[in-house]
């Protein structure tokens, strides 16, 4: 099922009991951040939150934890809310194979209802607050930022839709952090080499299929809009920006048009990041906002970031697993079974594979490290046998504890690249990486003494169903 806009998805969540509307007055700080943290603490079935009465703001509405649970993630895919995680993974992989899905272009969009072209003041337009108490200011952290390759502007796939943290630096200024591993950093370098500003458009309050696509580690020339269409099973709707040639999500609640100022930098940060730590302040580029559009009575969406798990981990979980899975299958089409890279955006990945010969699992681990996402993330790759479910951590721990020999099966590779936000990197952006081979040795490897593994009694599956039926009576 394709949701036409953010509001339609919220309505679907409400119908399924996965949206909690709060009408009592709340304070922007600390209530909004605390409520999102509390929702995450409730477990992997927690609801989205919609606040309609925020102290200090008139008619402001804020949504949080929108896809911060597996039921909500399943509904984003148009699946029943009780769909198991592994089934969501394989369904996402199936839809990934439908990429690219052509887009549907529209002439106008709901956010054109209101247009601000002068005296722009983001402090008046947006209900701003700090997510975590140590943040260095107000941030937009779940907005889709659109930019385009300047060397190949007609290549639709090289238009990027990404999610980057942006600090409100003034009434019409934002600081942005374009880390080197992200496409927008390439676009900014192209602009600054030419001595020109980089046009950008920022969309807030989008339906979750595009925020999911925007946080998926696609190849440089793969379109997030065409991926969003593949995920939802029908063309994704876009509309042209008025100040540039950029395409914008049709269903956005608020849209900001502007440009990154060439050569200009300001101190940005600190900010509580997806790693569960604050990242320190750095000198970062500045966006000048020139025009603002918004729907009547817009809904502002925010993303809580903190110690995992939070909504961020659901948003960048399965959509990180699937590209790694597909890229590994390109190299080993008959062996790769599944990939779990849901933890901290794939800084650790677990790969289930068949083994063709001795040492094969280590080769799989090497390939994972050199995928586009692996280059900037994947610090540790755990490789397990085909009969070990990488989404079942007790099984993975069993494989590590019984199959891995620390002397022979731990491979450490020094001084590889990682995103600078990794708090363990030293210097920032450089780290050692490790492959842990937790597969059963096959010839010509002869170490260990592995007898036939235990299996389940013959009627176990039938008894599982019988017990579930009895529990549900």
Curated annotation (Swiss-Prot):
One Pfam assignment: UbiD_N
Residues the record lists as binding prenylated FMN: 160-165, 181-182
Cofactor mode of binding and number, as noted: Binds 1 prenylated FMN per subunit.
Active site: 273
InterPro entries in the cross-refs: BsdC (IPR032902), PAD_UbiD-like (IPR053417), UbiD (IPR002830), UbiD-like_C (IPR049381), UbiD-like_N (IPR049383), UbiD_Rift_dom (IPR048304)
EC number: 4.1.1.61, 4.1.1.-
Sequence positions that bind Mn(2+): 160, 182, 224
One Gene Ontology MF term: 3-octaprenyl-4-hydroxybenzoate carboxy-lyase activity
Names of required cofactors: prenylated FMN; Mn(2+)
GO biological process, one term: catabolic process
Keywords for the protein's UniProt record, in alphabetical order: Aromatic hydrocarbons catabolism, Decarboxylase, Detoxification, Flavoprotein, FMN, Lyase, Manganese, Metal-binding
Knockout or disruption consequences: A triple bsdB-bsdC-bsdD deletion mutant no longer converts vanillin to guaiacol, the conversion stops at vanillic acid.
Listed GO CC annotations: cytoplasm; cytosol
Catalytic activity field: 4-hydroxybenzoate + H(+) = phenol + CO2; vanillate + H(+) = guaiacol + CO2
Induction annotation: Up-regulated by salicylate via the transcriptional regulator BsdA.
NCBIfam families: UbiD family decarboxylase, VdcC
Function field: Involved in the non-oxidative decarboxylation and detoxification of phenolic derivatives under both aerobic and anaerobic conditions. Phenolic acid decarboxylase that catalyzes the reversible decarboxylation of 4-hydroxybenzoate and vanillate. Could also catalyze the decarboxylation of salicylate. Is not active on di- and tri-hydroxybenzoate derivatives.
Note: It is not known, if phenolic acid decarboxylase forms a complex composed of BsdB, BsdC and BsdD. The term subunit is often used in reference to the operon, however there is no experimental evidence to prove the existence of the complex.
Family: Belongs to the UbiD family. YclC subfamily.
The name this protein goes by in its record: Phenolic acid decarboxylase
Species in which this protein is naturally found: Bacillus subtilis (strain 168)
């Amino acid at each position: 099922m394709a949701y036409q806009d953010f509001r339609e998805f919220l309505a679907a969540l409400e119908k399924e009991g996965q949206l909690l509307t709060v009408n009592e007055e709340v304070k922007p700080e600390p209530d909004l951040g605390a409520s999102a943290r509390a929702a995450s603490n409730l477990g992997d079935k927690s609801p989205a939150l919609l606040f309609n009465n925020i102290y200090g703001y008139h008619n402001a509405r804020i949504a949080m934890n929108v896809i911060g649970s597996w039921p909500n993630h399943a509904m984003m895919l148009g699946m029943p809310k009780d769909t198991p995680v592994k089934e969501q993974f394989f369904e996402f992989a199936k839809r990934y194979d439908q990429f690219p899905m052509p887009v549907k272009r529209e002439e106008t969009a709901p956010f054109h209802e209101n247009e601000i072209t002068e005296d722009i003041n983001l402090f008046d337009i947006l209900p701003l607050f700090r997510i975590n108490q140590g943040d260095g200011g107000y941030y937009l952290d779940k907005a889709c930022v659109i930019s385009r390759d300047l060397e190949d502007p007609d290549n639709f796939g090289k238009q990027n839709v990404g999610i980057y943290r942006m600090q409100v630096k003034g009434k019409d200024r934002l600081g942005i952090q374009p880390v080197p591993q992200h496409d927008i950093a390439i676009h900014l370098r192209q602009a600054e080499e030419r001595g020109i500003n980089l046009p950008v458009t920022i969309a807030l309050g989008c339906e979750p299929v595009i925020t999911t696509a925007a946080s998926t580690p696609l190849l440089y020339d793969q379109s997030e809009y065409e991926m969003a269409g593949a995920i939802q099973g029908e063309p994704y709707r876009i509309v042209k920006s008025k100040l540039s040639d950029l395409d914008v999500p049709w269903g956005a609640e608020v849209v900001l048009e502007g440009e990154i100022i060439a050569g200009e930098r300001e101190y940005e940060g600190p900010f509580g990041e997806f790693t569960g730590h604050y990242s320190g302040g750095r000198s970062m580029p500045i966006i000048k906002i020139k025009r603002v559009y918004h729907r009547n009575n817009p809904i502002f969406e925010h993303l809580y970031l903190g110690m995992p798990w939070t909504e961020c981990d659901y948003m960048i979980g399965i959509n990180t697993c699937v590209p790694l899975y597909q890229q590994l299958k390109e190299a080993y089409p008959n062996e790769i079974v599944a990939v779990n890279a849901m933890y901290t955006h794939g800084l650790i990945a677990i790969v289930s594979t068949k083994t063709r010969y001795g040492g094969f699992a280590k080769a799989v681990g090497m390939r994972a490290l050199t995928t586009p996402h692996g280059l900037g993330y994947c610090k540790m790759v755990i490789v397990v046998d085909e009969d070990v479910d990488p989404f079942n951590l007790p099984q993975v721990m069993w494989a590590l504890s019984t199959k891995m020999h620390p002397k022979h099966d731990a491979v450490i590779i020094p001084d590889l690249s990682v995103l600078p936000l990794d708090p363990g990197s030293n210097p920032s952006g450089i780290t050692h990486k490790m492959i842990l081979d937790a597969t059963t040795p096959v010839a010509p490897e002869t170490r260990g003494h592995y007898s036939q593994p235990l299996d389940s009694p013959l009627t176990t599956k039938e008894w599982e169903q019988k017990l579930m039926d009895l529990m549900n009576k």
